[in-house]
Amino acid sequence: MLDSIKNRHTITSIEQDSLKSWLRLILLFTIGVVGTVGMWSVVVVMPAIETEFNIDRGKASLLYATTMVGFGLGNFLIGKVIDRFGLTIPIIFETFILVSSYLTAIISTEFWHLLILQIFMGTAAATFFGPAMADIGNFFEKRRGLAVAIIASANYVAGAFWPLLISSFLELNNWKDVYFIIAIICATIMFPIAYFLKNNIANNIS
């Protein structure tokens, strides 16, 4: 009961629906589009991976299945971490995991290596989906529904954006080169955004 009262007091003390709230929305939307790349890149490069490891489509589809396993686990596990530590630390950690997974995939010599890495990519994608929606709800009151809907749409915008971009990269590069480019893009965009998101509501709850 006391925790509930304390949390309500903290939320009402935030300047909701302000310019800072909308800025946070833009940052979370951007990181949602970029950070969920792991759910979509594997779909585009799957034919190239089939050729690389001499496997059929059925076996290659396990890559997407393991991504979804990671996504499901991530929404639960990372959500609990964010409740305790706030949004910034998990975003920095999962960005590091995401970038490392892409770079490690480049030097992978066995198909099962990629399966494990896709679990981590799925977990990272989850960090920038459900928890981000929960976070932005604390910074809006009048436009809360709209704000949450915009953050939710980031994953689907990513589904339209990334396959087109990756397909164009694959026309000139192999899948490993594309993964390296993705790693650089994620690191360049997401680490700075994590810095600007440091004033998360959970960090202010004592």
Enumerate the language-model features and the residues they cover.
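Hydrophobic core of transmembrane alpha-helices in multi-pass small-molecule transporters
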Residues: 33, 101, 112-127
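Helix-loop-helix hairpin linking two adjacent transmembrane segments in secondary transporters
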Residues: 151-202
